[in-house]
UniProtKB/Swiss-Prot annotation:
Organism: Selaginella moellendorffii (Spikemoss)
Gene Ontology, cellular component aspect: SAGA complex
SCA7 domain: residues covered: 133-200
Name of the protein in question: SCA7 domain-containing protein SELMODRAFT_431321
Family matches, as InterPro entries: SCA7_dom, SGF73
Keyword entries, A-Z: Signal
Annotated signal sequence range: 1-18
Region feature (Disordered): 81-105
Lineage of the organism: Eukaryota, Viridiplantae, Streptophyta, Embryophyta, Tracheophyta
Length: 265
């Protein structure tokens, strides 16, 4: 009887799907009663193909076992925690500043860490952006600009002659102009008024040049027909012109037919 029950138990358990293999029971106990998700074959091969950690890296064999973390991570953690260089983003390479080289041999003071430490005289700001460099003033610039020097930087004002930031007396005191300030100011106002008058002039309508294009042939044909009709009306007597203007298109055709018959008779 006992032998019969022992041979029947595996079959019943297989049908009920309640048979626990020793390996499965260990997995369930380690994960809190939850069954683990099977890993992909590529992931398992990737862990096996990791480069082995060097013997002098300070990584123990227990850390290099599969299941805790990858060997590459173990090497990085050992380097960060040890005396070796930290693993991370590489720093910018130092460059030599030739302006600070004294005897041809660059020293420690000549090292500059990147382009942000270049002097402002070279046109570069601390953030690495290039400053806007103004060209020096010329005689032509002084004739159309304010030119009053700034009390802080000493740079001349680049506003036009009608600048409202500076007084007229300070503008007159600027040296280097070809004419007096009053004459230059009058010429400046005259030029501006002339430009405004030219802008107010209406532009001409379509011309021969405008109608000469391939896309404007229809417009040219219509204008030519309109001119021919105007010339035909001007050749008629005054009473017939008034009748032609007041009549409808059909009446105009009838009038032209009657006029042609009268001429023939």
């Amino acid at each position: 009887m006992w032998f019969f029950l022992s041979s029947l138990c595996p079959v019943v358990a297989e049908r009920c799907r309640s048979l626990l293999v020793p390996e499965d029971s260990g997995v369930d106990v380690e994960n809190g009663g939850k069954r683990t998700i099977p890993r992909s074959r590529n992931g398992m091969l990737g862990e096996d193909m990791d480069d082995a950690a060097p013997l002098d890296s300070g990584v123990s064999m227990s850390d290099m076992q599969m299941g805790s973390f990858s060997t590459l991570k173990a090497v990085k953690r050992a380097e960060v925690g040890g005396t070796g260089p930290k693993v991370g983003r590489p720093r910018k390479l130092s460059v030599y500043n030739p302006r600070e080289m004294s005897d041809g041999n660059p020293g420690e003071d000549c090292l500059v860490a990147g382009p942000s430490a270049v002097s402002h005289s070279e046109g570069l700001s601390s953030s690495g952006k290039r400053r806007k460099q103004h060209l020096p003033f010329t005689v032509d610039d002084l004739d159309i600009m304010c030119g009053v020097p700034s009390p802080r930087s000493g740079a001349p004002c680049r506003q036009p002659l009608t600048c409202k930031s500076h007084s007229i007396s300070s503008k007159r005191a600027v040296t280097g102009r070809r004419k007096p300030f009053d004459a230059l100011l009058q010429d400046f106002k005259d030029n501006n008024s002339r430009k405004s008058q030219q802008a107010d002039i209406p532009r001409p309508l379509a011309t021969k040049v405008y109608c000469s294009g391939h896309s404007q042939r229809m417009r040219a044909v219509i204008t030519s027909l309109y001119r021919e009709s105007i010339s035909g009306r001007s050749s008629l007597p005054q009473n017939e012109q008034t009748l032609a203007l007041d009549a409808n298109p059909q009446q105009q055709q009838q009038q032209h037919a009657l006029m042609s018959l009268n001429k023939v008779s």
